[in-house]
A protein has these predicted regions:
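Thiol/disulfide oxidoreductase modules built on the thioredoxin-like
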Residues: 84-87, 94-149
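A short beta-strand-turn-helix
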Residues: 14-35
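Active-site acidic short loop of glycosyltransferases
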Residues: 30-33, 63, 87-88
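Hydrophobic beta-strand anchors of alpha/beta hydrolase catalytic cores
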Residues: 36-37, 66, 115
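Non-globular targeting/processing and membrane-anchoring segments
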Residues: 149-163
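Conserved redox-active cysteine motifs that mediate thiol-disulfide chemistry
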Residues: 31-32, 39-56
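N-proximal helix/coil linker or "cap" segments that precede and/or mark the start of modular domains
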Residues: 1-14, 80
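Structural microenvironment flanking redox-active thiols in thiol-disulfide oxidoreductases
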Residues: 48-86, 96-103
């Protein structure tokens, strides 16, 4: 019983939010899939910088679900931002109360951007507070670490691309 409780501590909390285009996303329904959850905001400059990397992950790995969870933006702001910055993955929004609860449930999101990778078992396997940038990888190794965790979680080689 104690072991089951410890195992369940690593499971990610459930939430349901909508994307600006009206599609609903529920974490429980995504169990069995690999999810990259990115907490961010339109006013956050480092968040904007990592959009090409997140677009790349979204387009390269068919079985990876990339979700941008805005901590403060409205549906209209996300729609405009998505078009302006050519964001390829879903951008989710909620009330400040919903976002605060999700942030705390996920261990406290104290900086944006923060990326969390969730494996097929619904467990966090990677978390990083800061921008995941390919250009900084030679100094911080974050991009390559996340890429390795994605391919491990998906059970694919790095070259596995969407057709």
């Amino acid at each position: 019983d104690i072991l089951n409780k410890l195992i369940s501590l690593n499971k990610v909390p459930d939430f349901t939010l909508q994307s600006y285009d009206g599609e609903e996303y529920n974490m429980r329904s995504l169990e069995g899939k690999v999810v990259l959850l990115n907490f961010w905001a339109t006013w956050c400059y480092p968040c904007r910088l990592e959009i090409p990397e997140l677009n790349e992950f979204h387009e390269q790995y068919e079985d990876l679900i990339v979700l941008g969870l805005s901590i403060s933006d409205t549906k209209k702001q996300l729609e405009d931002f998505s078009k302006l910055y050519d964001v390829k993955y879903p951008l989710l929004y909620g009330t400040s109360k919903e976002i605060d609860k999700i942030s705390m449930d996920y261990g406290g999101i104290f900086a944006v951007p923060t990326s969390i990778l969730i494996d097929r078992n619904g467990e966090k396997v990677f978390s990083y507070p800061g921008a995941v940038l390919k250009q900084n990888d030679q100094w911080d190794g974050v991009y390559s670490t996340l890429l390795m965790k994605i391919t491990e979680s998906l059970g694919v080689e790095k070259s596995s691309k969407k057709e």
